[in-house]
Amino acid sequence: SKKSSVDPDIEDKSGTVINAPLGGNIFKVEFNIGDTANEEDAVIILEAMKMETAIKPPHAGKIKKIFVSQGDKVNPGDPLFEIV
């Protein structure tokens, strides 16, 4: 059976999914599943047209899911991560 990488604490809670505000490439994923992130934390750095955009959570919480990896191409509205 595939071991879930989700923290059992947060497994049952439904979180907020953060979507890409614009299309581009995932330059860096700064956090791991289970990490605590605050509103000012750049969880993901998105690179679009040579500009880096920090994607921050709307509220503090724990990272439940990360939908992208470094180097991925994303379109506007694609899910990036989920926070609970």
Where are these regions (language model features)?
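Structured functional modules or segments
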Residues: P8-V84
